[in-house]
Amino acid sequence: MKKGIVAIVGRPNVGKSSLFNRIIREKKSIVEDTPGVTRDRIYGTAEWLTREFIVIDTGGITLEDQPFAKEIKVQAEIAMEEADVIVFLLNHQEGLSDEDKMIAKILYKTKKPIVLAVNKYDKKTSDFDQYEYMSLGFGEPILISATHGIGTGDLLDDIIHQMPSHEEINKDNRTRVSIIGRPNVGKSSLVNSLIGEERMIVSDIPGTTLDAVDSVVKVNNIEYTLIDTAGIRKKSKIFQNVEKYSYLRSLTTINGSDVVLLMLDASVPISDLDTNIGGLAFEEKKPIIIIANKWDLVENKEKEILKKEDEIRAYFKYLAYAKILFVSAHDKTRITKIFTAVEDIRTALDKKIKTSVFNEVLNKAQLINPAPNFNGGRLKIYYGAQVEAYLPTFVLFVNNPDYVHFSYKRFLENQIRLQFGFEGVPMSIIFRERK
């Protein structure tokens, strides 16, 4: 399910990055770091009032060696294109500037919800004239100190209040399939082959070659939205306006997808950039299919396929649940299997396991492989149940969660996948002490 997107916009030195860090720290659940996965500092997930949303720090994508006006233009473009809510941040210590007024004119044209926040406010020493800021036309400002946390709760309350509902954000009822990968792995060629193979394209949604371009295709009476993202490049290469914009579009496209196709070039070795791109989808907990493209360029295919699969599994250990398909977009070899794999994932996402059946599998798993001693005791699982379907989530009631060894958790996950068919779908297993 797509999350809402919040963009923090403002001129330099108003505290955008400080506010970004403050909001991200407000998230109550901390996700464990995973080897091979990197998180870009301009993009993060937060939670407030049980609502998860994505935060974009436009301060993290300022242009180098560019005039100030172009920097503001890039920030506004990103906000207009991607955000569901825009936080317009001002600096109380410096007051309202001409640059602030220029940004306000740009943001006013977006017709999107604007939350006006005035940062660097110290209520003990500062005078405040709210009418000066209300003259911008965005209503009453919220006074905050991002550094000290003053007023950030009120700000988050207003953000959630202004954000569209889950239903409105996810109003496209087609299965949204995004195709991600580094440049030149054949993403656009694959989309063209899929559309050409089916010969049933419904429409093309206009975009540019640097944007994520949507195409709608119908297969077996099921409509899919295929999203071809611009190639994600190494961060060190992302200097120009268009490249930074493209990178951010790829990140937000992953957020809006139901299934992600991670494309690799099977004819060359896997790179760190490939694994980092896969990590973007992994962190968003998206169902993933790994597409090894350009298989037509590989010689001795029968001999090489096992080697290549082992290489992929070694580099993408955190995507052990993902299915691997070897295809050629150029000669259309095996590309129809992609839709079959997507439908398998759709089925898995809708699957709800009966508690009685689930516990039978759980008991058999413990007989096959009893839990080892760990942290001074042995894990005993009393019973479990599925509590959520879309991201399959299982709660297991145990004697002590501290006795769970990571390898045994992985064993249980593999058994659940094997018995119930959750290939390609991320899964969550929660251990709770029985009371």
Swiss-Prot record:
Pfam families xrefs: KH_dom-like, MMR_HSR1
Keyword tRNA processing: no
Residues annotated as domain EngA-type G: 4-167, 175-350
InterPro entries hit by this protein: G_ENGA, GTP-bd, GTPase_Der, KH_dom-like, KH_dom-like_a/b, P-loop_NTPase, Small_GTP-bd
Binding site for GTP 1: 10-17, 57-61, 119-122
Entry binding sites for GTP 2: 181-188, 228-232, 293-296
Subunit organization: Associates with the 50S ribosomal subunit.
Protein name: GTPase Der
